[in-house]
Amino acid sequence: MRSAWLDIPLADYEGHMAVPGVGQAEMLATLFAELLGQWTPASAAVIGCAGGNGFDRLRVDVTRRVVGIDINPQYIQELAYRYAAAIPGLELYVRDIQEPVERIAPVDFIYAALVFEYVAPKPVLQNLRSICRPGGVLATVLQLPSDHASPVSDSPFTSLKGLTSAMQLVSPAALAADANEVGFRFLSSRLLRLSSGKEFAVQAFERWRP
């Protein structure tokens, strides 16, 4: 089945995420920077990297290798244009993370924010395990159900409405259970709340199973 993400221009996606009533771009970039500061990985992968939101906050003297993975080739092309010169250790891949990930060396830290709402979680967790070093960390962000906001927020960027039918919220407990089954040990969880009323669960897992 064709991914809905292939039909959304990057400008629309970034514009939507930056709309004040949505406010998710700044939240996700800030969280990415915080997690990098917490774990100080020498290598990191961003799943669903789009145009590189938060890549400007990377400390390349600490995180020397950065892997970006996205299903949309236009997103990857724009990310390369923006950051290839600024991040010497940048590796970019056009991949469907629901398929086995091949020829990508494992990393110390994986950031998968607002990814699991659009994929089958368990197979993706298995694929992410293959690119996470033993002892490495997987950080996830899940959107939680809301009585006050629709899953895909209203904005002038109508192409985003195409995501509505593809989106399915995942409970943090279900993700943690799937993660444990494939070899990711639960470390922590916390809640983020935006002014729009939307809430997000931030979870961290450690790859422990050989």
Model-derived regions: residue spans:
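A short SAM/SAH-binding and catalytic strip from SAM-dependent methyltransferases
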Residues: 108-122
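Conserved class I S-adenosyl-L-methionine
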Residues: 137-170
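A short acidic, Gly/Pro-enriched loop at the edge of an enzyme's catalytic core
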Residues: 98-110
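Short alpha-helix
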Residues: 164-183
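Class I SAM-dependent methyltransferase Rossmann-like catalytic core
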Residues: 1-39
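A short, conserved alpha-helix within the catalytic core of class I
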Residues: 118-131, 140-142
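Class I SAM-dependent methyltransferase SAM/SAH-binding core
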Residues: 43-99
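Core SAM-dependent methyltransferase catalytic element
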Residues: 182-210
